[in-house]
């Protein structure tokens, strides 16, 4: 049981992250749950050192940031599904590492995400994976991780309730985006 394994390890899931744009933290399609890219946040604030791995952070700090990204992904999955026990396996992890020039240990950094998933789900936590070095990530965070899960069963009352939560989050994000656009004033086209 994933939630029991987290408790045994003394790991408490953070509050599910709120979207910072017009998207949902997680979307279910049939028996597949797609979790949006998660950054290393606690209580809505980036928690790890910022910058590029290999310059501003060590590989170990990047590894720790990737673990926190997965904890946020698990929190989003739990909100969407009503519990982590509904996850039957981890399908894929995609990890983005803001990398200094010449840094080539992205797979070691994203092992932070993979290792935690295997610790929590055992063999069902083993997954396909992509580790990519990028120039920059939103908010100057060092790592972003997205996860795809296979889930058990059909939609339940918890799923329907989660849909309402997701709809409210999306409406809230759209309102914030619209308010930001209005506060910036009209955009002007440059003369060519």
Where do the model's predicted regions map?
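Short, polar/acidic, helix-capping and beta-turn segments at strand->helix junctions
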Residues: 1-192
């Amino acid at each position: 049981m994933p939630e029991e394994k987290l408790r045994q390890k003394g790991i408490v899931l953070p509050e599910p992250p709120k979207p910072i744009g017009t998207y949902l933290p997680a979307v279910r399609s049939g028996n597949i749950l797609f979790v949006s890219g998660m950054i290393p946040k606690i209580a809505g604030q980036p928690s790890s050192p910022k910058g590029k791995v290999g310059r501003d952070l060590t590989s170990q700090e990047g590894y720790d940031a990737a673990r926190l990204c997965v904890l946020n992904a698990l929190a989003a999955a739990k909100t969407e599904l009503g519990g982590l026990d509904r996850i039957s396996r981890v399908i894929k992890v995609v990890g983005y590492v803001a990398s200094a020039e010449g840094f080539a240990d992205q797979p070691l950094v994203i092992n932070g995400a993979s290792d935690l998933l295997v610790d929590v789900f055992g063999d069902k936590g083993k997954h396909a994976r992509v580790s990519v070095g990028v120039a920059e990530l939103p908010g100057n965070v060092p790592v972003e991780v997205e996860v795809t899960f296979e889930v058990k069963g059909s939609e339940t009352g918890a799923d329907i309730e989660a849909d309402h939560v997701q709809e409210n989050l999306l409406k809230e994000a759209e309102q914030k985006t619209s308010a930001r656009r209005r506060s910036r004033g009209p955009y002007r086209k440059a003369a060519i």
